[in-house]
Amino acid sequence: MLLVIPAVLDAGKLDRVRKLLDQGKFVDGRLSAGITAQRVKQNEELESGSRQMEQLNNLVMGSLVQHPLYQAGAMPYRVATPYYARYTRGMAYGDHVDDPVMGPPGGGQYRSDVSTTVFLNAPDEYQGGELVIGTSYGEQTLKLPAGDAVIYPSSSLHHINEVTSGQRLV
């Protein structure tokens, strides 16, 4: 299952998202990766626990979970805390699958079967950076408009092509 969800965020929300990301502190994305993914992950993520993270979650996740296509396609019971990632020139994320278990260690963990990527900037703002998802129909390459999202099985082998110029925000 691969489902593109258009217009999760409108222009006004995207503008607020970009301003919050501009104010945020980004850290090495490998800090949130599992042991296997650490070897292939080259990006930066917004530092968790920041004021910007809370505001972004209200904007982005609030819009996503209320979107009727997301409700129908993902049928979410529980939604993990998102990561806000930035890829600049030379950054990529090699082949990986998303962690099947989410939540804090020692309690509150749960299985995750659906992954979501929300595109936060326009595809012409960066070169490369395509999301490539392996499906039973072959590889699907996505570089969606700002504000659009895609959901796909967390068990799908996928990668992010190297960004050759500009900045990719998801």
Where do the protein language model's features map onto the residues?
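Catalytic core of non-heme Fe(II) oxygenases with the double-stranded beta-helix
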Residues: 68-169
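Non-heme Fe(II)/2-oxoglutarate
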Residues: 1-83, 170
